[in-house]
Amino acid sequence: MLWALMCVALISIYLMKVGEMWGTNITRANEDELLRRGDAIRAAIDSYVRAESNGAFPRSFDDLLHDPRVSYPRRHLRAVYVDPITHGDWKLVTGPNGELYGVYSDAEGVPLKRDGFSDADVSFSLQTSYQEWKFVVYPSNGMVRR
């Protein structure tokens, strides 16, 4: 009888560890997806700004899906991605006149990832919250105006 109780206890401990590892793997996968989607949105904003000589920023995601400045279909973003951490809408980083500069997650968790970021995201290694991971294109980033 004692032997059976010890086996149940060991199996319970093992299953708890497996659950922790599984949760960590899911969190890491969601972080990777957050970086991928955020970088894609930032690249779309940059593409929109660079596509015309006036360097105007988009007003919304709709402008990225179909550029209203041209009469033919020009897409900078194929779809509006949801935030993979919250599974909801992104929070927007906007300019003084409502221009869309970028996005960030509204998730309150602490990121697991601390290094190995791309050059565009290297500042994320110092951030302590997903809300601080901002995928932004600012006009003052030395962007070349054509």
Model-identified regions with their sequence ranges:
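N-terminal single-pass transmembrane signal-anchor helix
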Residues: 1-18
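Membrane-proximal amphipathic alpha-helices
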Residues: 27-38, 54
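Hydrophobic faces of stable alpha-helices that mediate helix-helix packing
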Residues: 12-15, 38, 42
